[in-house]
Amino acid sequence: MLLSRHRERLAANLQETAKDAGERWELSAPTFTRHCPKTARMAHPFIGVVHRINSYSSVLETYCTRHHPATPTSANPDVGTPRPSEDNVPAKPRLLESLSTYLQMRCVREDAHVSTADQLVEYQAARKTHDSLHACSVYRELQAFLVNLSSFLNGCYVPGVHWLEPFQQQLVMHTFFFLVSIKAPQKTHQLFGLFKQYFGLFETPNSVLQTFKQKASVFLIPRRHGKTWIVVAIISMLLASVENINIGYVAHQKHVANSVFAEIIKTLCRWFPPKNLNIKKENGTIIYTRPGGRSSSLMCATCFNKNSIRGQTFNLLYVDEANFIKKDALPAILGFMLQKDAKLIFISSVNSSDRSTSFLLNLRNAQEKMLNVVSYVCADHREDFHLQDALVSCPCYRLHIPTYITIDESIKTTTNLFMEGAFDTELMGEGAASSNATLYRVVGDAALTQFDMCRVDTTAQQVQKCLGKQLFVYIDPAYTNNTEASGTGVGAVVTSTQTPTRSLILGMEHFFLRDLTGAAAYEIASCACTMIKAIAVLHPTIERVNAAVEGNSSQDSGVAIATVLNEICPLPIHFLHYTDKSSALQWPIYMLGGEKSSAFETFIYALNSGTLSASQTVVSNTIKISFDPVTYLVEQVRAIKCVPLRDGGQSYSAKQKHMSDDLLVAVVMAHFMATDDRHMYKPISPQ
């Protein structure tokens, strides 16, 4: 920040410069440059012929916008009160006296008789092109729409309301500039350069136009923010100002569609001649015809009557509360994506009751910037918002909050008492649905990409010389045949002899029982044995297997699995043993306890530090049939969540609705057994 004395000095310099520089440079005759070749000059309709380098400077555009604004100086709207044209005029540029003198030396007037004939022809052609653009009927039609909408929203639509929220301005621009692209496709870029001044977008490059020209736009906005309110105003002014345009409106409930239909009729009848309207209530259609012009139409429908919009032709289709639209109605709506001159605008709040139905959130990964989200928490502080119960708005206070929205801790607490998480969803919009997957993410995307892409060729002789002689296998058995529930996870890890902290994943299995029979222990042991055999064939340097069979679910079944595996394993195998406190007997099972958190932390650190890799020839007889085993594991790693406990500890979980974390737990524990030297492995003693 500037110190106060520097700020005062700069303000004094600015005041002195503005007082001394009075050159306005308003020319009645065109100006031509001296000694400028044709390839290095350009004709400008407001100035004359100048050097082409001016096209890369904002000074020329600022000067023209100031003295030749595209916005009308005396607007005559059909409704409402026009806004002052000075509101959208940039600051007047000031020229130093030395710069002004130099420019006058380089430029001459047309009446100085030094301009060449070809420069005059170039200027006249540029001027004619500019005048023809302003004389275009499409330009006047679109200009009338902006003037009418601006005046209508200037305290006429709702008394006392003169300004729009940022998302409402975005909605107007997405609607308007798409109309420009279909009404005047050859002159879209020229009209964009003119009409962007109406929105105060003086420094916006023409490349942004591609965003407005896209076939679909999505707006996720919290409730009670004026979504339907601005849609009614836009549709009303479109019908009254633009000819030959077809608009569609689809709502999630019949009473909403009827309310919008009635409000648009009320608005048009109040501010425009009622004789221009042709209302057909039986099919929810409004036809507006201006004297001497072609008619424009609006059809209001609901998702329950999806066949009513089939066969229609819409240039603009507004889908209100799209997250609550019936899924079987979506094909009829999305069919308009195939129409060349049609745009779909989805407007919705986030579905609090079932976040999985917020299908619009999938568009955040689209190649086009289709998703527009109104949120009161920025991405940088989303974690702070979730971790602090008393926090109700973004700590940086950079985001705009309307005056008619009340956000405080008491409202947050009361809302969440009705339904947990409802306030967060409504407040954060897209953030609440996506933050659950990213809030507690503990493994970075770069680390996962490296783990997935950089796999080690463990069959190479140079690599096998560095592999350890012992293979660590962890079995997390599940005794169920329900493929939607848990399955048996098996992980196999080997360490490096050169770097003990570095380890490699050689095999993984996610096994589900076919039937619940007495052979469950044998099937699980056979699955692990098949994996060990394949690993032994690919890596002949491995001499012994250190195994751990989890016995938390069933100690008897765990002992049975270890016993069978001990008999059929092709390599010498040792097991972790659990000592029975009552009988002092040792069983070949492992009772998983509080060390699970330590194992996850070790695994997470290994992934983030790059000390854990996967083999190019990962053995998997249960996953590889339909999925890449490493990618399958990565999907479970992405779901790892670290949840703080009340006692100050931490708990890790990766359970998902569509996928269990059995394989991940097995790999995590196998890695933990391989890198931790506190565990003792012993063979099963014959009785």
UniProtKB/Swiss-Prot annotation:
Keywords: DNA-binding, Host nucleus, Hydrolase, Viral genome packaging, Viral release from host cell. A motif (Walker A motif) lies at residues 221-228. Pfam families: DNA_pack_C (PF02499), DNA_pack_N (PF02500). It is an enzyme of class 3 (hydrolase). The active site is at 321 (for atpase activity), 476 (for nuclease activity), 550 (for nuclease activity), 662 (for nuclease activity). Interacts with the terminase subunits TRM1 and TRM2. Interacts with portal protein. Component of the molecular motor that translocates viral genomic DNA in empty capsid during DNA packaging. Forms a tripartite terminase complex together with TRM1 and TRM2 in the host cytoplasm. Once the complex reaches the host nucleus, it interacts with the capsid portal vertex. This portal forms a ring in which genomic DNA is translocated into the capsid. TRM3 carries an RNase H-like nuclease activity that plays an important role for the cleavage of concatemeric viral DNA into unit length genomes. This is Tripartite terminase subunit 3. It comes from Human herpesvirus 8 type P (isolate GK18) (HHV-8).
